């Protein structure tokens, strides 16, 4: 099962994957307690209401089930979704945008959120979940590796080592795992 907001993409995906539906994260079209596992990969930063989307993820996960989510890290030195400069969108990894104060960052990147450690966890406050694991992880550098194998390998090895040091806070994404409480039947 999966959701997508764009109808054309649902049609494309449905050729190979029959259970893709058009829906928004804030209103998942599934009954309560439906899934053993809910997986969200770099999506929650794009929705209109991230707290509502987090609540929906919990709602459709059965008691004892797992939620796995990845979301952008506010301390990563690049905004990976591009940014707006003078009303013009610039695609790519834009340095230091995420390190700006909120009002400035939101002017350059109004189309996407990036989360602090506490900020991503705060989305699930008041929900019947227990935090199982939360780390910040570095990227795999697949695109660089495809063009420059040695450089990609060097970056990957060095930064994967950084994940086990205080430098992990500067990684690309939050990797968060939550378990829905057994007493949380919807």
Residue map of PLM features:
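S-adenosyl-L-methionine-dependent methyltransferase catalytic module, highlighting the catalytic core
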Residues: 48-56, 66-179
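Generic C-terminal helix-cap and adjacent flexible tail
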Residues: 180-186
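Conserved SAM-binding loop
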Residues: 1-81, 175-180
